């Protein structure tokens, strides 16, 4: 195969250039490299997370999840709409607060948003049980929760980038 250090460098560069961080571990597992290459976390502006979380009041903009342990938010993350590695800024206009599940589905191309911030679900996404509380199918056609007054919705240019580069089209139609 390849020299381990070279392999790690190549894989790390590819992951950080072409894939959202939330998908790195799954990709490494899929190609049997999870024991050989450790995904490195990119350095981010800590103000981005704080600003996005405050804008969305520490709750998922898709489902409203707002779990806490000892008053500390858990399972809620600041997601970039346009990947940071593709020139997406660390700005609230490029961010959405999402629960861990919806962040992964958003970064994996399962979920996206229309210009009117209607939640889109890929036709290619399958679930075995649509009746579970966390079913992505329940989100089809719903409007995302807006940030609190004083904060803008995600910018249309970043939403279009997400749909054109990450979302697996076409979107499902509402029943």
Q: Which stretches of residues belong to each language-model region?
A:
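Short, charged surface segments at domain edges that flank catalytic/cofactor-binding sites
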Residues: 10-66, 82-93, 171
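Charged, low-complexity surface segments at secondary-structure and domain boundaries
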Residues: 1, 33-39, 142-147
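Mixed-charge, low-complexity interaction segments
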Residues: 1-33, 116-122, 128-131, 136
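Alpha-helical structural motif
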Residues: 6-7, 20-23, 48, 151, ...
């Amino acid at each position: 195969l390849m020299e381990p250090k070279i392999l790690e460098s190549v894989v790390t560069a590819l992951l950080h250039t072409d894939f959202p961080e939330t998908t790195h571990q799954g990709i490494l597992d899929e190609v049997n490299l999870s024991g050989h290459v450790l995904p490195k976390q990119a350095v981010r502006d800590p103000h981005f997370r704080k600003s996005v979380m405050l804008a969305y009041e520490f709750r998922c903009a898709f489902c409203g999840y707002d779990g806490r342990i000892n008053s500390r938010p858990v399972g809620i993350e600041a997601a970039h709409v346009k990947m940071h590695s593709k020139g997406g800024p660390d700005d609230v206009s490029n961010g959405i607060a999402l629960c861990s599940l919806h962040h992964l589905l958003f970064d994996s191309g399962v979920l996206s948003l229309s210009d009117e911030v209607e939640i889109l679900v890929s036709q290619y996404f399958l679930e075995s049980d649509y009746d579970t509380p966390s079913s992505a199918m329940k989100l089809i056609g719903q409007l995302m929760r807006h940030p609190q007054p004083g904060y803008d919705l995600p910018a249309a240019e970043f939403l279009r980038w997400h749909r054109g580069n990450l979302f697996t089209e076409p979107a499902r139609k509402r029943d």
